[in-house]
Amino acid sequence: MQHHFHFHLHHHAPRRARYDVDMTQGSTTRHLINFALPLLAGNLFQQLYNMVDTWVVGNFVSNEAFSAVGTVTPIINTLIGFFLGMSSGAGVVISQYYGAHRPEKVHEAVHTAMLLTIVMGVVFTGVGIAMTPLMLELMKTPAEVAPDQTVYLTIYFAGIMGLLLYNMGSGILRAVGDSRRPFYFLLVSAGVNTALDLLFVLKFGMGVEGVAYATIIAQAVSAVLTIAVLVRYDGSVKLSLRKLRIHWDMLKKIVAVGIPAALQMAITAFSNVFVQGYINHFGADCMSGWTAYTKIDQLVILPVQSLSLASTTFVGQNLGVGNVERAKGGVRQALYLSVAVTAVLLVPVLLLAPDL
């Protein structure tokens, strides 16, 4: 499904903020790579602090705790995947208006997206906590793992607002070409998470509960940093908390792009709940092996995900300014780069598979 928005291109280009990147001019390949690299680094750190969670509980708590933390990913990703689809819709709309030099429309889209995030955060907290017993039942969770999973998920969903605000805020920054500062914030968040993991588990003996609290505190830190930057932003995506409201025409545009992506990501994640259910039949040891595999799989796919996000911003800005051919060229170049990177990464994974 294609969504075409009509923009008036006679507006003068506004002064760009320091970290903004205009992708409507210059080398397509250079823009994609320069934009994707901070995204890749940020995603690696995000995976790193997820791995730290599982490493800490696996080494200092128990094998059951390792399985519990590592195998709740499909449940979390079902809700997070839906939200990420919606936030991608906001990013597409913002990048198109930004490319078309419509700062007043960018302003409306930013404030609509952030208020939508707050509403979804409240809903996800309630739905996530309420769904946890049902999802664990669908996953056929072994009795020895279920208590730890319930504790982890309840705390995680209670603090999910931070994750949503960070993801929407960083998506807004990426829409105007700024992929560096979201990376810096993830770097800080990863450091906070690692320190708190070790403090809560080793010093206070909090086990899975400590790891969950460390995660939501770290996510809250990244959210505060992102919102602070948007509030102080010298550009069209400047956020004013007093101006938060739903602009209904803008919401329709965001939903039109976001819902298909949201459903795709949520359904894919939800299907993994049943896959995890089959794995869980074999007990905690098999669950631990599956957890280790999924971590490797996630690392390999990160470069392609980063290029995908880079191409979203590139295409959005160029469609906004009316340069359809350049947008198509960006998609082709992103596909070429993705195939090349995947081919390179497949070699060590296949060769080292027995040892991994």
Regions found by a protein language model. Give the residues of each.
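Short membrane-interface helical motifs at transmembrane helix boundaries
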Residues: 123-154, 344-356
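Helix-terminus/linker motif at the lipid-water interface of multi-pass membrane proteins
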Residues: 44, 48-66, 136-143, 199-206, ...
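Interhelical loop/hinge segments that connect adjacent transmembrane helices in multipass membrane
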Residues: 2, 10-34, 215, 226-268
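Residue-level recognition of transmembrane alpha-helices
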Residues: 36, 43, 70-73, 117, ...
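Structural signal for membrane-spanning alpha-helices in multi-pass inner-membrane proteins
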Residues: 128, 171, 197, 201, ...
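Small-residue-rich hydrophobic transmembrane alpha-helices
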Residues: 66-126, 163-182, 290-353
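Signature of the first transmembrane helix
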Residues: 30-91, 95, 259-279
